[in-house]
């Protein structure tokens, strides 16, 4: 009888040890996944640093309950989405304020700019040496509140403006490069022989990974943003004979 009782107790303990925990079966992106370990949270905050060097004087991230009811910030994003390096892009950053364009510039702190594109400090195209100029003049800007974009398949998708991570709200910023003027000189691009060539400056695009909305879930997609300013030239028709 004692051997039978011993066997039943062992079987009962094995059953308890093998029973799956309920939190292991929670689908990715659900609110329950916000209860992560301290190690996972630390990795998430590292991924959210602007240029991996956030100014310590930035204000604390806004709480989700401070946002308007029904906003996209109420959709919780799983921090695990930020742990894979292939999803990280130097042109897409998550921060409470627009990052500086370079280490030498100060960040922009303008509370009135939240409802439009946030433009950081701009300056004329630098001249490194006397007599050296750029064919086209470009400007770098941090773009916020981007609500829609074209994905790599040509479809119009919804871009997440605010990201709710562990009940903290971060804004998604895009570093874009645009042409300042399609004709920096009256004849088109600077330095082009206008006697034989037509020229103009135009903005080109690239695709970056960004957080977008798919139903009520957040997902990574390649979207198109402005990335460079180039000169386009074409030969003028010449009459021979």
From Swiss-Prot:
<keyword id="KW-0481">Metalloenzyme inhibitor</keyword>
<dbReference type="InterPro" id="IPR029034">
    <property type="entry name" value="Cystine-knot_cytokine"/>
</dbReference>
<keyword id="KW-0646">Protease inhibitor</keyword>
<keyword id="KW-0483">Metalloprotease inhibitor</keyword>
<comment type="function">
    <text>Nerve growth factor is important for the development and maintenance of the sympathetic and sensory nervous systems. It stimulates division and differentiation of sympathetic and embryonic sensory neurons as well as basal forebrain cholinergic neurons in the brain. Its relevance in the snake venom is not clear. However, it has been shown to inhibit metalloproteinase-dependent proteolysis of platelet glycoprotein Ib alpha, suggesting a metalloproteinase inhibition to prevent metalloprotease autodigestion and/or protection against prey proteases.</text>
</comment>
<protein>
    <recommendedName>
        <fullName>Venom nerve growth factor</fullName>
    </recommendedName>
</protein>
<keyword id="KW-1015">Disulfide bond</keyword>
<dbReference type="InterPro" id="IPR020433">
    <property type="entry name" value="Venom_nerve_growth_factor"/>
</dbReference>
<dbReference type="GO" id="GO:0005163">
    <property type="term" value="F:nerve growth factor receptor binding"/>
</dbReference>
<dbReference type="InterPro" id="IPR019846">
    <property type="entry name" value="Nerve_growth_factor_CS"/>
</dbReference>
<dbReference type="GO" id="GO:0090729">
    <property type="term" value="F:toxin activity"/>
</dbReference>
<dbReference type="InterPro" id="IPR002072">
    <property type="entry name" value="Nerve_growth_factor-rel"/>
</dbReference>
<keyword id="KW-0165">Cleavage on pair of basic residues</keyword>
<dbReference type="InterPro" id="IPR020425">
    <property type="entry name" value="Nerve_growth_factor_bsu"/>
</dbReference>
<keyword id="KW-0732">Signal</keyword>
<dbReference type="GO" id="GO:0008083">
    <property type="term" value="F:growth factor activity"/>
</dbReference>
<feature type="disulfide bond">
    <location>
        <begin position="189"/>
        <end position="231"/>
    </location>
</feature>
<feature type="disulfide bond">
    <location>
        <begin position="136"/>
        <end position="201"/>
    </location>
</feature>
<dbReference type="GO" id="GO:0050804">
    <property type="term" value="P:modulation of chemical synaptic transmission"/>
</dbReference>
<dbReference type="GO" id="GO:0038180">
    <property type="term" value="P:nerve growth factor signaling pathway"/>
</dbReference>
<dbReference type="GO" id="GO:0043524">
    <property type="term" value="P:negative regulation of neuron apoptotic process"/>
</dbReference>
<dbReference type="GO" id="GO:0048812">
    <property type="term" value="P:neuron projection morphogenesis"/>
</dbReference>
<keyword id="KW-0964">Secreted</keyword>
<keyword id="KW-0339">Growth factor</keyword>
<dbReference type="GO" id="GO:0008191">
    <property type="term" value="F:metalloendopeptidase inhibitor activity"/>
</dbReference>
<dbReference type="GO" id="GO:0007169">
    <property type="term" value="P:cell surface receptor protein tyrosine kinase signaling pathway"/>
</dbReference>
<comment type="subunit">
    <text>Homodimer; non-covalently linked.</text>
</comment>
<feature type="glycosylation site" description="N-linked (GlcNAc...) asparagine">
    <location>
        <position position="145"/>
    </location>
</feature>
<dbReference type="GO" id="GO:0030424">
    <property type="term" value="C:axon"/>
</dbReference>
<keyword id="KW-0446">Lipid-binding</keyword>
<keyword id="KW-0325">Glycoprotein</keyword>
<dbReference type="GO" id="GO:0030425">
    <property type="term" value="C:dendrite"/>
</dbReference>
<dbReference type="GO" id="GO:0021675">
    <property type="term" value="P:nerve development"/>
</dbReference>
<dbReference type="GO" id="GO:0008289">
    <property type="term" value="F:lipid binding"/>
</dbReference>
<dbReference type="InterPro" id="IPR020408">
    <property type="entry name" value="Nerve_growth_factor-like"/>
</dbReference>
<dbReference type="GO" id="GO:0008021">
    <property type="term" value="C:synaptic vesicle"/>
</dbReference>
<dbReference type="Pfam" id="PF00243">
    <property type="entry name" value="NGF"/>
</dbReference>
<feature type="propeptide">
    <location>
        <begin position="19"/>
        <end position="122"/>
    </location>
</feature>
<keyword id="KW-0800">Toxin</keyword>
<feature type="signal peptide">
    <location>
        <begin position="1"/>
        <end position="18"/>
    </location>
</feature>
<dbReference type="GO" id="GO:0005615">
    <property type="term" value="C:extracellular space"/>
</dbReference>
<comment type="similarity">
    <text>Belongs to the NGF-beta family.</text>
</comment>
């Amino acid at each position: 009888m004692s051997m039978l009782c011993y066997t039943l107790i062992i079987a009962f303990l094995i059953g308890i040890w093998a029973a799956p925990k309920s939190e292991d079966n929670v689908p990715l992106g659900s609110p329950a996944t916000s209860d992560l370990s301290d190690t996972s949270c630390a990795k998430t905050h590292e991924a959210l640093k602007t240029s991996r060097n956030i100014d310590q004087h930035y204000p604390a991230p806004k709480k989700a309950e401070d946002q308007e009811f029904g906003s996209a910030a109420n959709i919780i994003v799983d921090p695990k989405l930020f742990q894979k390096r292939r999803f990280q892009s130097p042109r897409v950053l998550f921060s409470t304020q627009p990052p500086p364009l370079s280490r030498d510039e100060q960040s922009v702190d303008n509370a009135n700019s939240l409802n439009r594109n946030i433009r950081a400090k701009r300056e004329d195209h630098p001249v490194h040496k006397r007599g050296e100029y750029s064919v086209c003049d470009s400007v770098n800007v941090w773009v916020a509140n981007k609500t829609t974009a074209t994905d790599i398949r040509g479809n119009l998708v919804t871009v997440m403006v605010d990201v709710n991570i562990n009940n903290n709200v971060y804004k998604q910023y895009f570093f874009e490069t645009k042409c300042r003027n399609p004709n920096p000189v009256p004849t088109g691009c600077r330095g082009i022989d206008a006697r034989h060539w037509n020229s103009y400056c135009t903005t080109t695009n690239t695709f970056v990974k960004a957080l977008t909305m798919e139903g009520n879930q957040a997902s990574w997609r390649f979207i198109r943003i402005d990335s460079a300013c180039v000169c386009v030239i074409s030969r003028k028709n010449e009459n021979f004979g």
